Amino acid sequence: MTKITEVAAAVIERPGEFLLAQRPAGKPYPGYWEFPGGKIEPGEDPRSALVRELREELGIEVRAATPWITRVYAYTHATVRLHFWRVTAWDGEPQPLEDQDIRWQSVAAPDVAPMLPANAPVLAALALPAVMIVSDATAMGIDRWIERLTALVVQEQVLVQVREKAMEHLRVQHLVSRALTRAEPFGSRVVVNSDSGSFPQATGIHLTSRALMEATARPAALLVGASCHDADQLAQAVRLGLDYAVLGAVKPTASHPGATPLGWERFADLARDLPMPVYAIGGLTRADLAEAREHGAHGVALLSAAFG
């Protein structure tokens, strides 16, 4: 059995930026850029290791950190399991205490190279917005929904999921085209729910849980996610190499009044140690974002509270 080295890795964030460190001479992959962190010692949990490593490596004291994603990568010299945490508050100013270079990078356009192979895919995950909005144009009306979307994307970058199961194909096509025109100039991306049809002009596709379980390979799209409700569906999303999952319902919802919600503890159990970002959905608002992240979510997906 291959020995796996457990590593705590920090995504240290300030508005629009994150911190990378360059590996010094004398270590494997010298000159490569990576997220700060280091090995988890026997008896340590990932958060404790993270706090210790950032104190030793950068001279900062972590005040706020939340679990994010976990990725396994096999290098020629070692196989590592990287436990990524998002660090959003700390005391002190990061300093290179181990002869390494450090640089703040734009989330939208990081410009250092080369990146450690294990860390490069993390940049795509980090670029996903914290909020997904799910369309409700059938009930609201296309013009009104587009008007609300237009006002939103000027202020906030979001991931837009067009999900209109009761709308005819040509009207969905019209909605997708207008959503793309409004959203893309401001950096927001648009995916279309697989129940609404195929629209190659969109950024990507969002699989229903049924379509997810029927899939034998990742769909050919730039961005692919899926709705999940249990561990089996999440495992299938991992097997297909999807870019994100949406997991819920976390709280009671008006659309599914008889369903038993997951609750935050069950959500955390299901989302733990997954390699892709997970959005929490179900009865949530933007006010739930902090709690969602405490339980391992990348962000929240909103329907009724999308514009509230």
Where are these regions (language model features)?
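Glycine-rich phosphate-binding active-site loops on the catalytic face of alpha/beta enzymes
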Residues: 209-217, 246-258, 283-308
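Alpha-helix-loop-beta-strand connector modules within alpha/beta enzyme cores
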Residues: 173-191, 209, 216-230, 258-285
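Conserved N-terminal beta-strand and adjoining loop/helix that marks the start
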Residues: 1-19, 70
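Active-site mouth loops of central-metabolism enzymes
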Residues: 129-145, 223-228
